[in-house]
């Protein structure tokens, strides 16, 4: 049986990208004493935050003792779902995330809020002595990310970002092939996300804040604006005040693997072009089409995204192509393949 100490050790390995298998899924069932429970609190219950909590709860050592959301309807429904999963009522329900951070019984905080909140909440959790699982992207700027890294180091906390593909074996296998050198010299990496499921967002008028929603808390560090449903819950990601569009939604996953595969960090130069070409008059602010070229010493990484179109490169709607002189390795969430270079 995995002990509390083992859990923290495995979490550290995952955060460092050193563990291949998600420990949530493969935990060995067994009896766990109350003092050995890892007590988790979730901030932001609507989307990926609750998916993350469900993954945590697959480990019998994890106990959810707190949920926080600014929307009463979301908070109450997630509390009921959590009770159905665990058979226990969640002890603490909050609308103010600071009260969750102040709860001394919590060991681990899951940050599942919109992107503009990640930095403040992750840093506060570290200051309070909590370990943190933070949804991607880590932050909305390089400086935010630097602050977050410094906080994790200063307070000696275990922090993992939601780059969950790092724990998926077939991605690791694909990178092992890239690193083997069998592709020959890699001249470019094509990274793409064509998301046909993303609809145009019709313009809607501002309206009064619905009952049960603490909108001022939702805005937090973002500029003060009237309530508009287009900017709230899932579709926040298409507005610059809170996020960066498809680039920071999908790009953060896929570009991570471009850097990992090529064993690099920052490029020498970046050039980008795009705009609202597919849906020029809808409510979204972020580009629905974008191409970006990152130039390194002897290769490039090319990002390409489109909203409302599914037909991307290599017959896939997302993925990476490591283009080498001997062939191209293509990988996405369904698997990977090597396409040999044709010899005339």
Description of each model-found segment:
Residues 1-134, 143-158:
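N-terminal glycine-/serine-/threonine-rich beta1-alpha1-beta2 phosphate-ribose binding loop
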Residues 131-133, 139-212:
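A contiguous active-site-proximal alpha/beta segment in oxidoreductase catalytic domains
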Residues 173, 185, 190-192, 196-238, ...:
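Contiguous beta-strand/loop segments that form the cofactor/metal-binding neighborhood of enzyme cores
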Residues 40-43, 64-68, 110-112, 133-134, ...:
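Structural recognition of the beta-strand scaffold that forms the well-ordered cores
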Residues 50, 119, 123, 146, ...:
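A structural signal for well-ordered alpha-helical segments within the folded catalytic domains
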Residues 88, 125, 151-157, 180-184, ...:
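Secondary-structure transition/capping motifs at alpha-helix termini
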Residues 71-74, 94, 114-118, 138-140, ...:
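Short, solvent-exposed turn/loop segments enriched in Gly/Ser/Thr/Pro and often Arg
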């Amino acid at each position: 049986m995995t002990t509390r100490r083992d859990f923290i050790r495995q979490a550290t390995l995952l955060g460092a990208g050193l563990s291949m298998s998600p420990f949530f899924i493969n935990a060995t069932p067994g009896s766990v004493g109350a003092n050995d429970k890892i007590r988790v609190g979730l901030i932001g219950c609507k989307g990926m935050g609750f998916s993350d909590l469900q993954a945590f709860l697959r480990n019998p050592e994890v106990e959810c003792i707190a949920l926080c959301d600014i929307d009463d309807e979301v908070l109450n429904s997630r509390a009921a779902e959590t009770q159905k999963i665990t058979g226990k009522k969640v002890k603490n329900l909050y609308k103010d995330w600071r009260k969750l951070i102040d709860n001394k019984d919590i060991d681990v905080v899951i940050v599942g809020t919109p992107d503009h909140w990640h930095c403040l909440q992750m840093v506060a959790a570290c200051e309070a002595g909590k370990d943190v699982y933070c949804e991607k992207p880590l932050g909305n700027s390089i400086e935010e990310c630097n602050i977050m890294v410094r906080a994790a180091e200063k307070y000696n906390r275990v922090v993992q970002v939601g780059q969950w593909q790092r724990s998926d074996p077939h991605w690791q296998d694909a990178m092992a092939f890239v690193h083997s050198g069998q592709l020959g010299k890699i001249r470019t990496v094509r990274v793409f996300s064509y998301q046909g499921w993303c609809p145009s967002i019709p313009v809607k008028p501002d309206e009064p804040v619905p009952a049960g929603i603490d909108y001022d808390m939702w805005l937090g560090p973002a500029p003060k604006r009237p309530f508009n449903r287009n900017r709230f819950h899932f579709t926040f990601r298409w507005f610059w005040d809170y996020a960066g569009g498809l680039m920071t939604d999908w790009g953060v996953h896929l570009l991570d693997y471009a850097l990992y595969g090529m064993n690099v960090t920052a490029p020498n130069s970046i050039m980008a072009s795009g705009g609202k070409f597919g849906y020029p008059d809808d409510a979204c602010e972020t580009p629905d089409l974008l191409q970006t070229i990152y130039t390194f010493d002897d290769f490039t990484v090319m990002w390409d995204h489109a909203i409302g179109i599914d037909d991307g490169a290599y017959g896939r709607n997302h993925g990476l192509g490591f283009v080498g002189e001997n062939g191209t390795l293509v990988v996405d969430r369904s698997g990977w393949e090597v396409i040999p270079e044709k010899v005339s």
